[in-house]
Swiss-Prot record:
GO molecular function, one term: holo-[acyl-carrier-protein] synthase activity
Name listed for the protein in its UniProt record: Holo-[acyl-carrier-protein] synthase
Keywords: Cytoplasm, Fatty acid biosynthesis, Fatty acid metabolism, Lipid biosynthesis, Lipid metabolism, Magnesium, Metal-binding, Transferase
Catalytic activity: apo-[ACP] + CoA = holo-[ACP] + adenosine 3',5'-bisphosphate + H(+)
Organism of origin: Bartonella henselae (strain ATCC 49882 / DSM 28221 / CCUG 30454 / Houston 1) (Rochalimaea henselae)
A single GO BP: fatty acid biosynthetic process
Protein's cellular compartments: Cytoplasm
Lineage: Bacteria, Pseudomonadati, Pseudomonadota, Alphaproteobacteria, Hyphomicrobiales
Length: 133
C-alpha cells in the first residue's frame, strides 16, 4: 500500500547560483558524502546536485513533514546502485518519521525517480508499505 507520495521541481540555475555563491558550505550542509562524491565526479555537477535536492524535497513531502519539521537535509541521501538506479536512504529523524507512517508489522520501500532537462530537475518519491515476511 502507498503511505507517502511526494514530488519536486527544482530550477538547476538556482542550484548553480547557490554553488557559485556558497560553494562548499552549501554542499556540506545539504548533501551526504556519497551524494557529493557522485555529483563531483560528473561533468554536469549542478544538474546532479539539483536532482538530489529535488529528491530530498520530494521525500520530505512524502514523509508528510517537509524540511522545516526537524528532518535534516542529510537525513535523506540518494545512493546509486551499481546498475545506476537511484535509491533514497533515510537515517535519523527521517527514518523515525518513516516508521511512524508504517502500519504495524510492515516494512517500506522507497521508490525514486529523478530526471533533468535544463533548466529543470524533477524527482518523484513513492513510499510503499508491505507486510513483513
Amino acid at each position: 500500500m502507498i503511505v507517502g507520495l511526494g514530488s519536486d521541481l527544482t530550477d538547476i540555475r538556482r542550484i548553480e547560483r547557490m554553488l557559485a555563491r556558497y560553494g562548499d558550505r552549501f554542499v556540506q550542509r545539504i548533501f551526504t558524502d556519497i551524494e557529493r562524491n557522485r555529483s563531483e565526479s560528473l561533468q554536469k555537477k549542478s544538474s546532479s546536485y539539483a536532482k538530489r535536492f529535488a529528491a530530498k524535497e520530494a521525500c520530505a513531502k512524502a514523509l508528510g513533514t517537509g524540511i522545516a519539521c526537524g528532518i535534516n537535509w542529510k537525513d535523506m541521501g540518494v545512493i546509486n546502485l551499481p546498475s545506476g538506479k537511484p535509491i533514497m536512504k533515510l537515517t535519523n529523524r527521517a527514518q523515525m518519521q518513516l516508521q511512524k507512517l508504517l502500519p504495524s508489522h510492515h516494512d517500506a520501500i522507497i521508490h525514486l525517480s529523478m530526471t533533468d532537462d535544463f533548466p529543470w530537475a524533477q524527482a518523484f518519491i513513492i513510499i510503499e508499505a508491505f507486510p513483513r515476511g
